[in-house]
Amino acid sequence: AEDHQNYYVISEMFEKFTQGYDIVCASRLMKGGDYKESKEPFIKSILVKLVSFILIKFTNLQTLDPTNGFRLFSRQVIKKFPIQSKRGFTFAIELLAKAYRSNFKITEIPSQNPIRNFGKSKFKYTSIIFYLPWFLYILIFPPQK
């Protein structure tokens, strides 16, 4: 992990989990959340907002911030879906996509993404190649009935 999250939200995530949700996403883009861009690569901040806009506009995905990998997954989600992703944080988007298609309960809580005071993002532009198939999966394959 990049050690770049507000871990104070873990108790709130767990509370949502105890209410029956299978995935609880920390969202920087929902009301009460905050996405500090000052030390993030400019292209990354544009991509985060673009992907979120597209998925919100064309799907019923229950998170406004699908690119944030800070999530709580239920044991059922982890056991049901073998992880195929081999690079970086792609597994978080993969599990979200598969759970969405299988009608697992997904919710989000607001989270602030603090300004990075040390280190740098592990985001690589080449990672987009690995994220893209899962975003397309969400767009192309609606939840099963």
Q: What name fits each language-model region?
A:
Residues P143-Q144:
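A charged, well-structured terminal subsegment
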Residues F17, A99-Y100:
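Hydrophobic residues within well-ordered alpha-helices
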Residues F89-L95:
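Acidic donor-binding loop at a coil-to-helix junction in glycosyltransferase catalytic cores
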Residues T63-D65, N103-N113:
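Catalytic beta-strand/loop signature of glycosyltransferases that borders the donor
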Residues Y7-F89, I115-T126, F130-F135:
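Acceptor/aglycone-binding surface of glycosyltransferases and processive sugar-polymer synthases
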Residues A1-H4:
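The conserved acidic donor/metal-binding loop of glycosyltransferases
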Residues S27, A99, P110:
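Residues at the C-termini of beta-strands that transition into short coil/loop
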Residues K57, S102, L139:
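Phosphate/oxyanion-binding loops and surfaces in catalytic or ligand/nucleic-acid-binding neighborhoods
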